[in-house]
């Protein structure tokens, strides 16, 4: 078979399969009639969302508001934090406020607590006693000490998932007259602006590393080819500090595989576990925005349609059931990363999936595989979720939502809930019902910049009011460290020539607090210490005025 000429122009690996393809009754999302949410659907989704929200709210660490990696119904300490779970949790708090599960004030207080904890932890290249380095966070944290747990890696993808939650709360809590919401926006901005995006880039191939350890350096793995790292590249290209160039997107997409599967006749960009098709869409609306790597799949083809096809392919595999599991079928399906019945001789936690070069299937189904795809294909997801809840009852479902996974062939039901599996269920259900998360994220310049610089055009990107910001010229390299700080911080700046300088400190309301300098200084680097111990915590600004211009620097004082 001759490969189309347009394919040769794209850095894609197009796999033409010789499988016998099963005919499918399938419609692209723009062809299918809009799904009408019935009263019964609304009742079911209300309960599912509320119960899943309860897990994030009730199981968060009490002293920090940060979310654990996993828990059981009866877990109480919940101090082992997953920063990816925190990203879903921050977003969940906004959904809870919008749905009335908690008040907006309660949600804002919880978010403020969590952001302050993330800022309070120490950032350095030390191996112990630190929360992260260069603005990136360790995969797992001990909430009691706000430091690295289990010798985990400084994780690129998990930091990105957390940052999406930070972006969400920066834009959701938008009341300019509310001091608490203003503090949330300020804290979120500091967290976002200090991520050194270029730090994780492999200088040899433009790819983003899977992570870094102080003991051994960068992990020997870069994200390349379609998976959940789409969100990581969009943030890194659109970020504030040392963003990656557009060429990084070209490197990432050069590993794409486009193919059909044995049981699904429609080609799509494959990644076997469904979570890779879900995480980016939980926050970003990819409907109607296009990129050149998608042209070969059709004029209207977008990443939303790609995720819909992946969902249908996953279900089609389970219906075909080549391994003859006793329960697979039209309403019992869903393969992605999840726990498993390891004690029964099966796999434990593993990235299961049903498309791409490797099928991983040991009979273990997880509700998040279907639930995280509800926005793409509610017509097949809602019947599956209802069926699993009704059939297995309290063995699989509780007032914290669905437990992580089950394997009917050995009568195994997980006792754990996992944050990164709970999150897609809650966020995607909200996007189906109100598009709250998507619409909130569209307000942020990091998201808009990242998409536009990666080459996305069309749809809502053409009408957004968010314009790419021009970075200010840092005439004096005004800065301070540490930032955030506890009582004392050192303010630094540089002068190109001898000149008059005034350096003042202002609080968040614009009132001058003190004058640190009002004199003539020689050219060169300068620094001075500022003691804020007698002032209330919060946001402060240093303002440097000279004969050559003005520059300001935001500083965050925490205790």
Spans of model-derived segments:
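Bacterial N-terminal signal peptides
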Residues: 10-18
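Short, compositionally biased serine/threonine- and acidic-rich segments at solvent-exposed termini, linkers
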Residues: 462-468
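Bacterial N-terminal signal peptides that target proteins for export
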Residues: 1-10
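Short, solvent-exposed coil/turn linker segments
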Residues: 2-3, 213, 245, 531
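Ser/Thr/Asn(+Pro)-rich, low-complexity disordered segments
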Residues: 24-462
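Sec/Tat signal peptide C-region and signal peptidase I cleavage site
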Residues: 19-23
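C-terminal outer-membrane/trafficking sorting elements
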Residues: 4, 469-559
């Amino acid at each position: 078979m001759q490969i189309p000429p347009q394919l040769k122009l794209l850095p894609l690996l197009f796999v033409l399969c010789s499988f016998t393809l099963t005919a499918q009754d399938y419609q692209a999302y723009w062809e299918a009639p809009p799904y009408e949410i019935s009263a019964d659907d609304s009742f079911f989704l209300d309960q599912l969302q509320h119960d899943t929200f309860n897990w994030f709210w009730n199981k968060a660490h009490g002293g920090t508001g940060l979310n654990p990696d996993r828990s059981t119904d009866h877990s109480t300490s919940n101090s082992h934090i997953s920063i990816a779970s925190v990203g879903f949790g921050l977003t969940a708090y906004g959904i809870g406020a919008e749905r009335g599960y908690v008040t907006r004030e309660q949600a804002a207080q919880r978010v403020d607590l969590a952001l302050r904890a993330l800022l309070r932890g120490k950032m350095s290249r030390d191996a112990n006693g630190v929360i992260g380095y260069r603005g990136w966070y360790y995969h797992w944290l001990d909430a009691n000490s706000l430091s690295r747990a289990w010798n985990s890696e400084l994780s690129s993808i998990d930091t990105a998932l957390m940052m999406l939650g930070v972006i969400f709360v920066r834009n959701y809590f938008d009341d300019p007259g509310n001091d608490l919401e203003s503090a949330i926006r300020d804290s979120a901005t500091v967290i976002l602006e200090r991520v050194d995006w270029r730090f994780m880039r492999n200088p040899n191939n433009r790819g983003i590393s899977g992570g870094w350890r102080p003991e051994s350096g960068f992990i020997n793995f870069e994200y390349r080819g379609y998976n959940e790292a789409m969100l990581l590249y969009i943030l890194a290209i659109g970020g504030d500090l040392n963003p990656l160039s557009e060429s990084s997107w070209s490197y990432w997409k050069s590993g794409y595989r486009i193919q059909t599967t044995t049981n699904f006749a429609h080609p799509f960009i494959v990644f076997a576990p469904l979570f890779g098709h879900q995480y980016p869409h939980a926050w970003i609306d990819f409907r109607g925005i296009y990129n050149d790597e998608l042209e070969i799949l059709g004029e209207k083809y977008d990443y939303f349609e790609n995720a819909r096809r992946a969902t249908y392919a996953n279900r089609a595999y389970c219906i075909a059931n080549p391994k003859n599991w006793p329960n697979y079928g039209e309403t019992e399906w869903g393969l992605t990363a999840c726990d498993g019945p390891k004690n029964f001789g099966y796999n434990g936690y593993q990235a299961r999936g049903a498309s791409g070069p490797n099928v991983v299937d040991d009979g273990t189904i997880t509700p998040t595989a279907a639930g995280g795809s509800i926005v793409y294909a509610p017509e097949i997801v809602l019947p599956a979720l209802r069926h699993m809840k009704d059939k297995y009852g309290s063995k699989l479902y509780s007032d914290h939502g669905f437990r992580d996974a089950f394997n009917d062939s050995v009568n195994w039901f997980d006792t754990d809930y996992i944050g990164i599996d709970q999150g897609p269920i809650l966020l995607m259900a909200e996007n189906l019902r109100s598009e709250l998360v998507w619409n909130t994220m569209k307000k942020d310049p990091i998201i808009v910049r990242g998409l536009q610089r990666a080459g996305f055009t069309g749809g809502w990107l053409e009408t957004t009011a968010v314009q790419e910001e021009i970075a200010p010229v840092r005439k004096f390299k005004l800065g301070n460290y540490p930032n955030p700080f506890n009582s004392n911080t050192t303010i630094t700046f540089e002068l190109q020539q001898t000149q008059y300088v005034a350096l003042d400190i202002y609080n968040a309301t614009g009132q001058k607090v003190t004058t640190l300098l009002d004199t003539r200084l020689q050219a060169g680097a300068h620094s001075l210490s500022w003691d804020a111990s007698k002032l209330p915590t919060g946001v402060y600004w240093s303002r440097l005025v000279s004969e050559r211009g003005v520059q300001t620097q935001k500083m965050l004082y925490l205790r």
